């Protein structure tokens, strides 16, 4: 059994770690609230844009934009949103497993995959396991801006425009609540039609002024950008929630470990006292 001094040292070490995890839990809780506010502020725009674009996909368009047309699938692209930091439980690895399973399905059909990575964890993971990485951006911090995301988005849209990609998806964690974050793979291009059953029953006619091509080019690009930005802010809220939960679990586990070590310490101290008493009694008997 370890000595009492060694056990006291272990208890002190766990207590110091517990202070760190508690502080990280509180910081993550504060950042999560800010991330939720940012997510809530951008969500109406993203959802409205998705609704409008969904109407367009169902409409009788005088100009059929390439982003609205299905193609034979030979290569697909994924915009993968991950975190820049760790200590957030299985948030990243669960997302990567979901993506790898989907990529395996495409591979079995003879379809190749391109990856545009957002976040250092995705860059590190796919740099190790393999995958065709065509763009990446890292170090966006806790307040990402659309200008920081333009690079990967532009690369993927250019590949789609040139016919090198036939489908484009965004991969991120969807924020459900503080305790639940869900890996999500959402198709961006070609534009999926609106899922609302009532909308599908209607025929939509639009008048475009001055030019439908110029208007749709701009509108559809804004749509993709808005969905990517929303995916990033949702992933950030998911990251902070997962980190808060992970740090709380670490703090609680530290408390349990301290109790166990305290019991071991008490037993060691009791054994030491018993041994001393035995030696004293033995010495007295010898006299």
Swiss-Prot record:
It is a peripheral membrane protein. SUPFAM superfamilies: ATP synthase (F1-ATPase), gamma subunit. GO terms for molecular function: ATP binding; proton-transporting ATP synthase activity, rotational mechanism. The keyword Membrane applies. GO terms for biological process: proton motive force-driven ATP synthesis; proton motive force-driven plasma membrane ATP synthesis. Keywords: ATP synthesis, Cell inner membrane, Cell membrane, CF(1), Hydrogen ion transport, Ion transport, Membrane, Transport. InterPro entries: ATP_synth_F1_ATPase_gsu (IPR035968), ATP_synth_F1_gsu (IPR000131), ATP_synth_F1_gsu_CS (IPR023632). It is found in: Cell inner membrane. Its main location: membrane. It comes from the Bacteria. Disulfide bonds: none annotated. Belongs to the ATPase gamma chain family. Produces ATP from ADP in the presence of a proton gradient across the membrane. The gamma chain is believed to be important in regulating ATPase activity and the flow of protons through the CF(0) complex. F-type ATPases have 2 components, CF(1) - the catalytic core - and CF(0) - the membrane proton channel. CF(1) has five subunits: alpha(3), beta(3), gamma(1), delta(1), epsilon(1). CF(0) has three main subunits: a, b and c. This is ATP synthase gamma chain. It comes from Yersinia pestis. The gene is atpG.
